[in-house]
C-alpha cells in the first residue's frame, strides 16, 4: 500500500462555470474524490459563473482575491483547478495566491504514478508527467520551486520528478526508448495469444465501475479492489474456464 509520511495537504477546489448548470458541481465532486485518492484533504470549493475564462488568471480578478482570502482563512496548503491550466495561468495564480497551484491533470497523473505497478505502466506514467511538466517550465521557476514536494510532484515509486529542462529532455528520450522496447515485447505476446485461437475478452468501463471486482469474481485473480478512483491502473490478464 502506498505510504505518505508527509503532512496531509489541505486544498481548495475551484472552477469556472460557463453554462451556469449542474455539471461543474458534479465535476468538483469527482475532483474531490481524486484529491482524496492522491492523499490530500479538501477544505472547500469555489465556483465562478462566467461567460469566458480569463486567459491570464483563469478566474476573474475579484474571484482571485476571494480565493486568496479563502486560502488564508482556511489554512489551505494549495488549490486545485478542475480544468487544465495553461503555464501562464498557473504562474500568475501562484504569484497572486502565494500558494501551491495544481490542476486536475496533475492530480490524475499523480494518482497514476501512485498506482502503476508494471514496468511499462511506470514508464508510461513518468513519461506523461515529464511531458506535461516540460511544457510548463518556461517562466515557471517559482511555481516549480513551490511544487517541491507533495501531490502533483511525485513520479512512480515516490521518486521526485525532475525540474531541470535539459535533464527532463534526456529522461524523456530514455523513457521513450525503453517504452518502445516494452511495447514491442507486448506485441509479440499479443500475437502469441491470437495464434493460440483462445477467445480473448476484455472488461472495460469507467474508473471505479467494478472491473477489478468482476475480474476477481470470475477468475479469482486477486487484483486490488478499492472504492477509489483509479485504484488499479495496469492491465491484467487471467485465464477463465
What would you call each of these model-derived segments?
Residues 3-9, 140, 145-241:
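Conserved G1/Walker A P-loop phosphate-binding module
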Residues 31, 79, 130, 168, ...:
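Residue-level signature of catalytic and energy-coupling elements of molecular machines
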Residues 18-22, 53-57, 115-120, 159-160, ...:
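Flexible beta-alpha connector loops of hexameric P-loop NTPases
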Residues 121, 125-128, 132, 166, ...:
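Residues on a specific face of well-ordered alpha-helices
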Residues 106-125:
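Short alpha-helix plus adjacent loop in nuclease-associated cores
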Amino acid at each position: 500500500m502506498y505510504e505518505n509520511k508527509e503532512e496531509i495537504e489541505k486544498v481548495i477546489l475551484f472552477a469556472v462555470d460557463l453554462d451556469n448548470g449542474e455539471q461543474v458541481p458534479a465535476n468538483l465532486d469527482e475532483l474531490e474524490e481524486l484529491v482524496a485518492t492522491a492523499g490530500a484533504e479538501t477544505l472547500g470549493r469555489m465556483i465562478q459563473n462566467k461567460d469566458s475564462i480569463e486567459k491570464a488568471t483563469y478566474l476573474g480578478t475579484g474571484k482571485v482575491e476571494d480565493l486568496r482570502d479563502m486560502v488564508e482563512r482556511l489554512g489551505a496548503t494549495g488549490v486545485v483547478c478542475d480544468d487544465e491550466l495553461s503555464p501562464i495561468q498557473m504562474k500568475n495564480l501562484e504569484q497572486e495566491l502565494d500558494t501551491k497551484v495544481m490542476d486536475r491533470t496533475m492530480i490524475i497523473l499523480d494518482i497514476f504514478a501512485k498506482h502503476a505497478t508494471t514496468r511499462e505502466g511506470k514508464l508510461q506514467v513518468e513519461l506523461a508527467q515529464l511531458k506535461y511538466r516540460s511544457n510548463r517550465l518556461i517562466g515557471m521557476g517559482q511555481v516549480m520551486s513551490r511544487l517541491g514536494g507533495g501531490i502533483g510532484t511525485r513520479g512512480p515509486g515516490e521518486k521526485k520528478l525532475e525540474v531541470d529542462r535539459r535533464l527532463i529532455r534526456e529522461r524523456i528520450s530514455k523513457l521513450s526508448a525503453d517504452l518502445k522496447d516494452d511495447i514491442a515485447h507486448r506485441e509479440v505476446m499479443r500475437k502469441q495469444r491470437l495464434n493460440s485461437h483462445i477467445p480473448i475478452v476484455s472488461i472495460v468501463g469507467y474508473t471505479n465501475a467494478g472491473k477489478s471486482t468482476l475480474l476477481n469474481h470470475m477468475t479469482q485473480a486477486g487484483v486490488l479492489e478499492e472504492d477509489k478512483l483509479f485504484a488499479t491502473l495496469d492491465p491484467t490478464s487471467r485465464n477463465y474456464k
